[in-house]
């Protein structure tokens, strides 16, 4: 059954759009009869004309920078587990692990000990004192909490770290003595700090427990005497005269209870010999103090500043 479908009416705005489209089509320029396709001979003539004409300005030539060659690490075709190389392995070891490894290697191969001794850098005063102060810290931390720190019980508790500190002192002190150490200033600097460590050792109520402390004073006193004699031979005893060691050693002797008196006498005899026979003849402390003050004034450049200057005939 055929049915007629009525065409829906067109909205008014569609008519307006069609009028605008017609107007745009009418404003399109028309092609003139003179416009035609270019032929091959026209292109050739135009090319010859452009080639014959000299350009007004040459284009600037900009060099092209080539990309720099990168060091690309070649990738391994096959990835598999492998141990670390020696440099990387040493980077992972701390100080204690490295020391233990070297110690075990020297025990298994005694020939390596001499090579390590000659290859390792020479210990300095600061590095040696750092080790000694670490032993001193271990000793202080081993004391029991509360109670009498000078009792026999406390001595038994700290006996092991005390022995380690005294052994370290006995081992490090000869290293800084002549002839192994040729600089008197280095030897004196070490002895000054090492004596302070001995002053800090605990004093026990039982006299028998103080034998180790007294032995440490005897050893350090002998070391002082050896260094003083060697320093007196070098440079006219300059280190002993102007380093203030007379006052420092006197203070150490006072803190030790007179256990360094032999070193004080040795230093006084060396300084008296340097000052001449007049100083030894007087023998009093006033003469030494006067000479010391004159030396200090000469070194500081203030000698004679307070003395009035005569004006006129002499």
UniProtKB/Swiss-Prot annotation:
**Subcellular localization, as worded in the UniProt entry:** Cytoplasm; Nucleus
Keywords, sorted A to Z: Cytoplasm, Nucleus, Protein transport, Transport
Location, primary (coarse class): cytoplasm
Q: Compositional bias (Polar residues) at which positions?
A: 24-34
Q: Where is this region: Disordered?
A: 24-83
| Cytoplasm among keywords | yes
The UniProt entry's GO CC annotations, sorted and at most eight, read: cytoplasm; nuclear membrane
* Residue stretches of biased makeup (Low complexity): 52-63
* Entry's Gene Ontology BP terms: nuclear protein quality control by the ubiquitin-proteasome system; proteasome localization; protein transport
Q: Where is the composition biased (Basic and acidic residues)?
A: 39-50
Highest taxon in the source lineage? Eukaryota
Q: List, in alphabetical order, the Gene Ontology terms for molecular function in this entry.
A: proteasome binding
Q: Does the keyword Electron transport apply?
A: no
Q: Could you tell me what this protein is called?
A: Tethering factor for nuclear proteasome sts1
